[in-house]
């Protein structure tokens, strides 16, 4: 997966590092970190990413708002978005998928599960 770039959006520095590490070390991708949805949107608006991984509950802008902005149009509207959250309720998953999330994973999540989801969405297998 060399030369592919992911945007990891989560307000937890530890989770951002864990996801970025998995993408970099296990999947061979570059990863940029963003601390909340607003930071993620700024970085997405000025960079090129093949996939976005986002939490839901974050300050300033939550992950669902970010998914909605991505899907509203523009150059990134077709970028796969993986929601990775502690929100395991079916109505939360349904909201995310209705807004346009490509996949929904519930924390705690294993690095291999994240990598497999990314590979599937990017059709790299």
Task: Give residue ranges: language-model regions.
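Acidic, metal-coordinating helix/loop segments flanking the phosphotransfer/catalytic sites
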Residues: 33-51
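His-Asp phosphorelay/catalytic-motif detector in bacterial-type signaling
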Residues: 48-50, 75-80
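Receiver (REC) domain active-site loop signature in two-component systems and cognate sites
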Residues: 58-61
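C-terminal output helix
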Residues: 109-118
């Amino acid at each position: 997966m060399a030369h592919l770039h992911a945007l990891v959006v989560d307000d937890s520095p530890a989770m951002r590092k864990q996801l970025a590490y998995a993408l970099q070390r296990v999947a061979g991708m570059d990863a940029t970190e963003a601390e909340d949805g607003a930071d993620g949107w700024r970085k997405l608006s000025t960079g090129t990413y093949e996939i976005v991984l986002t939490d839901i509950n974050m300050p300033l802008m939550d992950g669902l708002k970010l998914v909605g902005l991505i899907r509203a149009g523009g150059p990134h509207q077709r970028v796969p978005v993986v929601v990775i959250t502690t929100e395991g309720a079916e109505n939360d998953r349904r909201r995310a998928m209705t807004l346009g999330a490509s996949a929904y994973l519930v924390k705690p999540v294993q690095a291999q599960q994240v990598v497999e989801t990314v590979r599937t969405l990017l059709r790299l297998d």
